[in-house]
A protein has these predicted regions:
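N-terminal glycine-/serine-/threonine-rich beta1-alpha1-beta2 phosphate-ribose binding loop
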Residues: 1-131, 140-155
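Extracellular/periplasmic catalytic domains that process cell-envelope and extracellular macromolecules
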Residues: 34-36, 99-102, 124, 149-151, ...
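Structural recognition of the beta-strand scaffold that forms the well-ordered cores
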Residues: 40-44, 64-68, 107-108, 130-131, ...
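Short, solvent-exposed loop/turn elements at domain surfaces
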Residues: 49-53, 74-76, 99, 195-197, ...
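A structural signal for well-ordered alpha-helical segments within the folded catalytic domains
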Residues: 116, 120, 143, 165-169, ...
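A contiguous active-site-proximal alpha/beta segment in oxidoreductase catalytic domains
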Residues: 128, 136-211, 216
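The substrate-binding groove and active-site-proximal loops of carbohydrate-active enzymes
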Residues: 132, 159, 243-246
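Glycine-rich, aromatic-lined ligand/substrate-binding cores of catalytic
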Residues: 210-381
Length: 381
């Protein structure tokens, strides 16, 4: 029988439509949750990030089921099964949803191309969902999930580590106080891909791991034979399964400027990509693979938080912006070694931070540099 807290979840979800966030202190009353008031959670995708997230949930809720297409796979699946020996284990998430009648919510930490179909299936059964970033594989799926969430009145959240970190809060404070004046340009970059990307997939005869259900791993994608070029981890570099460096890291890096400046849809977007050259002057076009590097320029109108049009430039594949005059030459851009970061450039100075908005710094001419230390990127709201 559903307890009071679970009923409250259902009622709170009816307040608004679409994807939104209900803070933990709301779900838990005054922050005191009795054992009988725990939610029954299942993890779909028990390795990698799924393993990490399950540990976070288990500190407050009850993990009653685990699901993974590779039951003895690496990247934490075995660890999850040992940590939660009383949780029922499934290979097919559909079987799990059919069997586990007492479920309240699921976490989804699977390859990008399966997020939409799994989340829609769960929400259509009245389950609340926590979906790892990126929310979906494409825009159409995101719109579909928004409609399904509203129809079924469920609580939803996308996992975006760093989304409510102290770094974001501090940058918001600096922006609101207009310490660097009107912001007119943003640079954001990552050292990703750190997986093979920009190449044609090789035709290799490989033996599928014995306990991997490859058909379930493929899910809605076209049937193809097993290859280690996809599983584990490397699926990120192929359009049929992942979203490349931008889709993998953009939400962690672009979140701070989007949130603090109140950005919405861009007015226009321009993209250029770099590719790998097979030999001298012979360019390698890879239609199914994400680019080896890219530069994406987005233009935004002024917002209520920033009275200036903004040009945002995203870079990946090892590309990054030139060193601004406002930042000392011996200082890193963004994070240590300048591997990932954000520069928000205004009339009076520059704000710099790393991925997850870690370690924000404020540089202003004639003033001492302000540095704010953070290490709380696991804040996900």
């Amino acid at each position: 029988m559903k307890n009071k807290r679970r009923n409250f979840l259902k009622k709170s979800a009816a307040v608004g439509a679409g994807f939104f966030i209900v803070p933990r202190n709301v779900l838990g009353g005054n922050g005191f949750i009795s054992p009988s008031d725990q939610l029954n959670i299942a993890a779909i995708g028990a390795g990698g990030k799924g393993n990490d997230i399950t540990h976070e949930w288990a500190s407050k809720e009850r993990v009653i089921a685990l699901c993974d297409v590779h039951p003895d796979g690496t990247h934490g699946v075995t660890d999850s099964r040992k940590t939660y020996p009383n949780a029922n284990f499934y290979i097919d998430y559909r079987e799990m949803l059919d069997q586990e009648k007492d479920l309240d919510a699921v976490t989804i930490s699977t390859p990008d191309h399966t997020h939409g179909v799994i989340a829609s299936n769960a929400m259509n059964r009245g389950l609340h969902v926590y979906v790892q970033k990126p929310l979906t594989h494409n825009i159409e799926e995101a719109r579909m999930l928004t409609e399904i969430a509203a129809k079924n009145k469920v609580v939803t959240q996308m996992g975006n580590q760093g989304g409510s970190s102290q770094g974001v809060t501090k940058i918001q404070e600096w922006v609101d106080k207009k310490l660097i004046g009107k912001i007119h340009k943003i640079y954001a970059w990552t050292n990703r891909p750190v997986w093979p990307q920009g190449f044609d997939m090789k035709d290799m005869d490989e033996v599928k791991p014995p306990n991997l259900n490859w058909d379930l791993w493929l899910g809605p994608a076209e049937s193809t034979k097993y290859t280690s070029q996809l599983h584990p981890f490397n699926w990120r570099g192929w359009w049929d399964y992942g979203t490349g460096a931008l889709g993998d890291m953009g939400c962690h890096i672009l979140d701070a400027p989007y949130k603090t400046l109140g950005l919405h849809y861009p007015t226009d977007v321009e993209c250029s990509v770099g590719s790998v050259f097979e030999q001298a002057w012979s360019q390698n076009f890879v239609p199914k693979g994400c680019p080896a590097s890219s530069i994406v320029t987005l233009n935004f109108d002024k917002t209520s938080k920033n009275d200036s049009k903004i040009e945002m430039v995203w870079m990946d594949g090892g590309l990054r912006p030139s060193h601004p005059d406002a930042i000392p030459a011996d200082d890193f851009l963004g994070e240590v070694n300048s591997t990932n970061g954000v520069l928000m450039i205004g009339e009076k100075g520059v704000i710099s931070c790393g991925v997850y908005a870690l370690g924000p710094k404020l540089y202003r001419k004639g003033y001492e540099t302000i540095e704010f230390s953070t290490n709380d990127y696991w804040n996900c709201l």
